[in-house]
């Protein structure tokens, strides 16, 4: 069995490619079923966020090309598009990659906590849809344990910084009097909730939350002291917003160039600052062509995020050390489990020899033979049968100068304690 991790992320692919490869929430269960139905794929899980799409599989062979081809077919993409951006890892390197992702070490914002929650959702989806077997189940559980250890034992999670924080930080640098600005947030998920809290902490004046379901918008608005509206009310609210930050799971853009042009006229062309965190994008790229609009995507937040990365370099080094220890533990346990089948077959062989010797001894006792002689014969028979096969193979190994086998046999077959007692 081979463990495979394959995907693209913000370091290997542009936002245009990432949004083409992203799975919508409605697609995930079906995609997982398709992936697991591929020949040789025994277990599978799918992670899809604004910054990465990754597939984790247990396969009969390496299988990375088959999985990559499937990813392209699912999204109707030419092979060369993915070939230029995709990466893959096998076995120990795949496990290391997953643990680094879970700990936030592979994120755009170093140490950001949201990815662990997103990984847990991917794990739960795979579990609910029969995607997991023993191998991925154990790997994910161990990964979550290592990620928790990283967060509790290093400074990687201190002063939480995320894409949400980076967006608010950029906005606060652009507006001289942030306390007089008004913000419109589109979406009501975890990222927008973080944006709302960061905006409140930064002293934003007015805050409006728009969401497809008004009830969810009202729930978040109540928590952050904001106004709640539906998506249908955005055209009216847009004219009053200085800052617009959007992060939904919509497959189609929510803000178009015409809608924003209309809002600018009502604002008498006062500038609008927009950050589109969504993948696929919520704001049409043509909106950025308007003179009074400053439109940023998640990729544009890199400068703010890079400063954060420098501040967390020491914590990251500590985290890498913990992950390395976690990898070694996982590999040890995997090797132990790998010997399980060999141990089972060896014990079954020994049990078969014991049963045969016992059957013969009972038959001899039933015929009235001397019990002491029967026991002596039984012990000799068991000893000879148990040692016959290994003895032959040791002689063959010696004749072929297979010193590796002889050395392993010495470790496996000779009990040092027994040898010491014999010499005494």
From Swiss-Prot:
Q: Which CDD domains match?
A: NAD_bind_Glutamyl_tRNA_reduct (cd05213)
The cross-references to SUPFAM superfamilies, in alphabetical order and at most eight, read: Glutamyl tRNA-reductase catalytic, N-terminal domain, Glutamyl tRNA-reductase dimerization domain, NAD(P)-binding Rossmann-fold domains
What is this protein's name? Glutamyl-tRNA reductase
As recorded in Swiss-Prot or TrEMBL, the protein's gene is named hemA
Quaternary structure (record): Homodimer.
Any keyword Metal-binding? Answer: no
Enumerate the GO terms in the molecular function aspect: glutamyl-tRNA reductase activity; NADP binding
Q: Does the keyword Cell membrane apply?
A: no
The catalytic residues are 50 (nucleophile)
In this chain's numbering, which residues are marked as the site (Important for activity)?
97
* Enzyme class name: oxidoreductase
Annotated HAMAP family: Glu_tRNA_reductase
Annotated NADP(+) binding sites: 187-192
Q: What role does it play?
A: Catalyzes the NADPH-dependent reduction of glutamyl-tRNA(Glu) to glutamate 1-semialdehyde (GSA).
Q: Its GO biological process terms? A: protoporphyrinogen IX biosynthetic process from glutamate
Q: Which family does it belong to?
A: Belongs to the glutamyl-tRNA reductase family.
Q: Provide the alphabetized UniProt keywords.
A: NADP, Oxidoreductase, Porphyrin biosynthesis
Query: Source organism lineage?
Result: Bacteria, Pseudomonadati, Pseudomonadota, Gammaproteobacteria, Oceanospirillales
